[in-house]
């Protein structure tokens, strides 16, 4: 159960630690300038796979030679997260997410 393990996974390489995206992006920005990076959200990839792939092609300045033909995959189901846990995570990431959104100039709807 997710709630049982929340406190256990607060170290940097943990589930929760990996969610501090601004911290991760800072490391990449030490190696590359922002024009060399593209930020793709999972939500965009899932809702518009071909459009997202086209965006990547444009970013890389390569021909759009491939059309995405998604394979049907079995999706795993997860237990519903408790509202208290969702609120805990929203509050935990709030400051870091604000910093991330400022860094990348876009905002994701992660408060739901």
Q: What do these predicted ranges mean?
A:
Residues 5, 26-99, 105-112:
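The conserved 3'-phosphoadenosine-5'-phosphosulfate
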Residues 12-20:
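Acceptor-substrate binding/catalytic loop of class I
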Residues 1-13:
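PAPS-dependent sulfation machinery
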């Amino acid at each position: 159960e997710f709630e049982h393990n929340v406190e256990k996974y607060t170290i940097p390489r943990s589930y929760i630690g990996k969610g501090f995206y601004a911290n991760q992006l800072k490391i990449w920005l030490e190696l590359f300038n922002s024009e060399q990076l593209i930020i793709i959200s999972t939500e965009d990839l899932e809702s518009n796979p071909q459009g997202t792939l086209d965006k990547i092609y444009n970013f890389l300045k390569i021909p759009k030679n491939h059309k995405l033909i998604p394979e049907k995959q079995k999706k795993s189901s997860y237990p519903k997260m408790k509202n208290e846990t969702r609120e805990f995570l929203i509050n935990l990431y709030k400051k870091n997410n604000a910093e991330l959104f400022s860094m990348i100039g876009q905002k994701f709807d992660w408060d739901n």
